[in-house]
Amino acid sequence: MRVGLLTREYPPAVYGGAGVHVDFLVRHLREVAGMEVDVSCMGAERPDARAFAEQDSRFPDGNAALHVLSTDVAMAAHCGSADILHSHTWYANLAGHLGAMLHDIPHVVSAHSLEPQRPWKAEQLGGGYRLSSWVERTAFLAADAVIAVSRGMAADVLTAYPQIDEERVHVIHNGIDAHFYHRDPRTDVVESIGIDPLRPYVAFVGRITRQKGVPHLLRAGQRFDPDVQIVLLAGAADTPELKAETDDLIAALQGARDGVIVVSEMLPRESVRQVLSHALAFLCPSVYEPLGIVNLEAMACETAVVASAVGGIPEVVADGETGLLVPYSPGDTARFESELAARVNELVRDPGFARRLGEAGRVRAVARFDWASLASETVDLYRSLL
């Protein structure tokens, strides 16, 4: 079987959970399942994938979404040799949809997020958000199968697109590379970025987007125990408005307490692993999260997780067993921030409890989110469609 896998992100250009998912799915399909996988991605050339330019020179000032659609058309023209197409995120969904119609082959879409659940994307894409929403809807309604990365995501798919037959939606969770993500005893990276190894710290790793809830974390940080350090490994903000808001909150937090460390450049995975390994807790204050691979990464490093109880997070983080969950309501964000701080302070007061949560987290991550078994489920789905 030859799989045509369509994606925007592909190593080394991986910046989110969907890219991590694609990376490990392709590895396991090729190396474990022995399948032929033709990867079509966007951006610079890669040795093991066909790369398509993200910019169309015919309209250099056009909305970013138009450039994506132009790339999708080029992708669709080159996937006729596949037996099945599998697209990831709206960036590649149209390529899969057009390719399936053009070449008469089945199309599987993986739902890593849903545009109707992310209205703040309009702030970033402008009118392009209406295009991305149209692309996703069109591809999902026509797809032969939809893979949801959590049960929560499956429910969201059926709510957003009730025309989809429930039998076409299949839950296959994201996985974790437990061989790579493990507790790192070294502290050289931790110390090099300014963390005091003699004081506890909590860590956030992720993009600064509306989805990730960083402003909530920063406001909650005003109530954290004064001895705990706050470490943010956070990339650039999605929009100038969000950057200004985040910068103001960081400045206010740094003015109120010491030990607030912000690392804006992307660190190597090995460095992130070490920071996760020595944290008292990993913080995930997302307001929307279909699964949250980074929670699995923290758990595999034996670190407790304090996270919002949204989307697929409760399927990963067992409340009171591998971490602590905080209810989130968009109508009462002040309460969320207060309870987030309370859960962090609970672990500061009882580091032994935090250690037990972290140890149980690795057991759960390894036992339930193994990539080999999840890739096998994906292969079984492919075969059922041929």
What is the role of each PLM region?
Residues 43-45, 176, 229-248, 261:
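Glycosyltransferase donor-sugar binding loop
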Residues 87-92, 111:
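Short His-centered aromatic/hydrophobic patch
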Residues 152, 175:
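Carbohydrate-associated surface elements
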Residues 182-195:
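A short helix/loop element that forms part of the nucleotide-sugar donor recognition site in Leloir-type
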Residues 243-270:
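Nucleotide-activated donor-binding/catalytic signature segment of Leloir-type glycosyltransferases, i.e.
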Residues 287:
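Aromatic "clamp/platform" in nucleotide-sugar-dependent glycosyltransferases that forms part
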Residues 304-307, 317:
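Short hydrophobic beta-strand element within catalytic cores of glycosyltransferases
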